[in-house]
């Protein structure tokens, strides 16, 4: 199967590198007690070694990680709906619980192919769920202050607003 998909996998990997050429670094978003959250693009194997845990938002490119690995698969260019954001946040909370239970400093990487959109939307939803932000624009500002090239589109922002209403019990 790997041979069959090799051309696609190579193209997708190269595409992620071309789009992120100007911003290859991961960005530190937030530090909570012994856990620091970073946001970035799909990592190389050597990059994953800098982290004790990784959260993979990429459905189209596999990553081989020896670290604590959690995944919420989503496709590029398909905005996550509010229910999908909720499920992704639940999985991210599992990772954060595992990381915070450790006695040593934990570095956590949340990523998508480019580190611009899918992972950013999930992180914004998590920031609101954990009450680090009370509004969508505040969550986006937290992320963009560390990673200014992040851009969520109108549909993603709308879905984050719906997710926020669900958090408050105002949406079905």
Would you name each region that the model predicts?
Residues 1-18:
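Transmembrane alpha-helices and immediately adjacent membrane-cytoplasm interface residues
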Residues 13-110, 114, 125-171:
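Cysteine-based protein phosphatase catalytic domain of the PTP/DSP
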Residues 116-121:
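Glycine-rich nucleophile elbow surrounding the catalytic serine of serine-hydrolase chemistry
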């Amino acid at each position: 199967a790997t041979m069959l998909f090799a051309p696609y996998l190579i193209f997708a990997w190269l595409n992620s590198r071309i789009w992120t050429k100007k911003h290859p670094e991961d960005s530190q978003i937030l530090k909570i007690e012994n856990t620091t959250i970073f946001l970035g693009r799909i990592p190389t194997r050597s990059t994953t070694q800098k982290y004790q845990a990784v959260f993979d938002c990429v459905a189209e490119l596999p990553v081989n990680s020896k670290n604590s690995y959690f995944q919420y698969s989503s496709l590029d260019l398909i905005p996550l709906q509010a229910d999908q954001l909720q499920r992704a946040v639940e999985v991210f909370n599992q990772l954060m619980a595992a990381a915070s239970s450790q006695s040593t400093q934990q570095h956590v990487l949340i990523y998508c192919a480019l580190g611009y959109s899918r992972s950013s939307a999930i992180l914004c939803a998590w920031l609101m769920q954990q009450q680090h932000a009370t509004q969508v624009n505040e969550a986006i500002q937290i992320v963009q202050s560390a990673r200014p090239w992040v851009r969520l589109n109108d549909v993603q922002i709308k879905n984050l607003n719906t997710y926020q209403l669900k958090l408050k019990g105002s949406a079905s």
